A protein has these predicted regions:
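Short, contiguous alpha-helical
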Residues: 1-26, 58-117
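Helix-adjacent hinge/juxtasegments
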Residues: 13-54
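Long, charge-rich low-complexity segments
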Residues: 51-58, 115-125
Length: 125
């Protein structure tokens, strides 16, 4: 729960940076479902701002070096925890992922590029 709460804080911070501020707020973790909802809401707010014509108040480098890279670290932690719980995240070819602005919720379309193990003699990319 703390990881998800922290990731929500990170995307709130990223939005703040994108808007030309740099407000960091460390929230108190809530119940699991509330944190998941808050995470998706934070991600959606950042996604909408980045997709808009509003000017960026921080460089792309600052956003990636700060909150986004921090969040990627925690995504890796969650993947490790899932694998330890025999519920691994399926692999996919991220270069071919169907990424669309506004599609940031828990419900995602099936990805045709997901796999459990790459075909013998072939690489994932």
């Amino acid at each position: 729960m703390q990881i998800i709460a922290h990731m929500g804080d990170l995307f709130d911070w990223a939005l703040s940076m994108a808007q030309g501020k740099s407000d960091w707020v460390q929230s108190k973790p809530q119940a699991w479902r509330k944190e998941v909802e808050r995470f998706h809401a934070s991600l959606l707010a950042l996604d909408r701002y980045l997709a808009s014509d509003a000017p960026l108040g921080a460089t792309a480098e600052e956003l990636f070096q700060g909150p986004i890279s921090d969040a990627l670290t925690h995504i890796g932690q969650i993947a490790i925890l899932r694998r330890q719980d025999d519920s691994p995240v399926r692999s996919e070819v991220y270069a071919r992922a169907d990424i669309a602005s506004g599609r940031v919720g828990a419900e995602q379309p099936k990805n045709p590029f997901e796999f459990d193990t790459p075909p013998v003699g072939k690489t994932a990319g």
